[in-house]
Amino acid sequence: MALKVLVGQKLMNEVVKYKPPPPKKQGVTSAAGAGGMEWRVLVVDKLGMRMVSACTKMHEISAEGITLVEDINKKREPLPTMDAIYLITPSDESVRGLIRDFENPARPMYRYAHVFFTEVCPEELFNDLCKSCAAGKIKTLKEINIAFLPYECQVFSLDSPDTFQCLYSPAFASIRSKHIERIAEQIATLCATLGEYPNVRYRSDWDRNIDLAASVQQKLDAYKADDATMGEGPEKARSQLLILDRGFDCVSPLLHELTLQAMAYDLLPIVNDVYRYTPGPNQPDKEVLLDENDDLWVELRHEHIAVVSTQVTQNLKKFTDSKRMGSADKSSMRDLSQMIKKMPQYQKELSKYSTHLHLAEDCMKSYQNYVDKLCRVEQDLAMGTDAEGEKIKDHMRNIVPILLDANVSNYDKVRIIALYVMIKNGISEENLTKLFTHAQLSPKDQDMVRNLSCLGINVIADSRKKQYSVPRKERTTESTYQMSRWTPVIKDIMEDCIEDKLDLRHFPFLEGRAQNTNYHAPTSARYGHWHKDKGQAQVKNVPRLIVFIVGGVSMSEMRCAYEVTNAVRNWEVLVGSSHILSPEIFLSDLGSLSKED
C-alpha cells in the first residue's frame, strides 16, 4: 500500500471524519449544513497543511463537513459558532497559536477545539496548554503519530530543512540534542504508521548517526509498548531502518542527472512541484502539479530523457487510435491544442500529453544549450574513467576550460570543483585557490566547496585517512548511456543490505536488539488481510528496508528505492530524509553552514 494512500486514509479516518459528541449545554447554536451535517473548520500549521495537501483532496474533506482550511499562523476571521479541528505539530509556535485562539473568553475564535497533534506533545508544552484559557475549550486531544510528509509512494520527508544546519554546523551544537530528539520522533511515527518495528542500523563513520539511531530506538520501544502488534507478521522480523549521514555520498546530489524527474527539478524553475509552461502562441501560461495523481508522470519520471519524448508520442498515438481520433502525424502531435479544440471531451487526457511533451522539450533545450558538455566532465570525474573505461590521468585538462567559460554559471562551476576535490580526497590550499580564481567565484560560492568538510569530506589534503567508501559494483554495460554512467552509492547500499552483505563494521546494528535478518517465515497470503475492513490499507507481507539520510535525499537516490524494489520483489524499499534535494538546494545548504561556535 502506497505511503501516501496509507497516510491519507489515516488522516481521513482519525482526523477529518472524527465526529465529536454534541455539546451538552442548552442554547448553544452550531453551524449546521444541508442534511443536518455540522460544518467545521480545519486549522493546520506548515506540516499539517503539507500533509493534507499531499494526501487528501478538498472535495473529500468537504464531503465530511470541513468548510474551510486555515493556517494557524495567519490572521483569521472568528467563527464562534463552529468547532475547529486542529492538525498541528506539538511545537512551541503551534501550541501558542492554539492558546491565542481562545485567550479572549468573550470572543473565542471557534466554539470548541478538537486537537490532533502529529506526535507526542512535550510535557512542558502540554502543561502550558492545560494551564491556559484554551483548556476549557478543548473537547478532544489526541496524538495521531504522523509527523512526516509522504512525498511519493516510497519516499518520505520530515519537512525539516533546518536539520542540515542543526546537525552539520558547529554553530548549532548547543541545540543539536533537542533536534535529534525531534527528528527521531518523526522517524518513529513513520515506522508506527507502517506497522514496522525494524532492526536499527547506522553508518558508524559519522559520530551523530549513533545518537540518532539510539533516540529512534527509544521512541520505537515506546510505540511497541503501546501496540504489541507493531512489527509482527511473516517476514517483518527482517525489516531494517538504516540511518545514513549526507557525507556517505556527496557526488550524487551534485551531478547533472538525465532521468526526467531529476533533470527537470535541476534545470527548470519548478517550485513546490509545480511546472509552468506556455502551451502555444497567444496562450496563457499553464501550471501543472507533478505528482502521483498523474499516471503519465509516474510512468516517465525515472526514464532517461533520450526516450521520454518518444514514449509520450507513442502513448498519445495509442490514445488517439483507441478513441478513433484519426492518425496524427508528428507535427500535429506536437501541437495538441488543435486536437483539444476538436475533441473537448478528451481535454484532460490530451493536456496531460501536452504537458509532458513540453517538459521533455524544456529539459532537452537546457541540455543542448550547455549541460551536455558539463555532463561528460562530471561523469568522468565521478567515475575516474572516460566513456571507454580508460583511467583519466589529467582531469585538469577537462576542468579548466569550463571554469574559464563565462557562459557557465557559478553554481555549475562549484559543482565541478566540488567533484574534483572529492575524487582527489582533498587538494592543496594553493590548488584550491587557483581553481576558485579561474572560476572567479565569490567568497560565498567558495564556502559551498569548503563547507563540505563539515560533512566529513577532505577538502584540503592532509594526513587524514580517506573515509571508508562502499565497494562499488560494476554496472556499465553497452546499453548504459555515456552521460549516465554513475550510479548513486545508495543503490549499492540498499542491495547489500537486502542481501546481508553490508559491512557490519561500518554499518553496525544498534546493540540490544537481536538481529534476525535471515528469518524466512512461511508467508500466508491471508495474513494481515482477512480481518481488515475493506476501506483499510492492506499490509504488505514483505520486509521493508527504510533508509533515512540526515540532510537531504536527491532525486536520483529516490529513484534507486523503486529500482531495487522492482528488482528484488520480495522487499519494499523506502527512502526519506529531512528534506528533498535538488543540486541548487544542496549547494545552498552547504553555503549557509556557519563554522562559528
UniProtKB/Swiss-Prot annotation:
InterPro entries assigned to the protein according to its UniProt record, in alphabetical order: Sec-1-like_dom1 (IPR043154), Sec-1-like_dom3a (IPR043127), Sec1-like (IPR001619), Sec1-like_dom2 (IPR027482), Sec1-like_sf (IPR036045)
Disulphide-bonded residues: none
GO cellular component, one term: terminal bouton
GO molecular function (one): SNARE binding
Membrane topology (UniProt): Peripheral membrane protein
Keyword match Cytoplasm: yes
SUPFAM superfamilies found in the cross-reference section: Sec1/munc18-like (SM) proteins
Compartment(s): Cytoplasm, Cytosol; Membrane
Cited Gene3D superfamilies: 1.25.40.60, 3.40.50.1910, 3.40.50.2060, Syntaxin Binding Protein 1, Chain A, domain 2
GO biological process assignments: chemical synaptic transmission; exocytosis; exosomal secretion; follicle cell of egg chamber development; intracellular protein transport; liquid clearance, open tracheal system; neurotransmitter secretion; positive regulation of dendrite development
The keyword Membrane is annotated on this UniProt entry: yes
Keywords: Cytoplasm, Membrane, Protein transport, Transport
Family: Belongs to the STXBP/unc-18/SEC1 family.
Function: May be a component of one of the vesicle trafficking pathways. May interact functionally with Ras2 protein.
Protein name as it appears in the record: Protein ROP
Gene for this chain: Rop
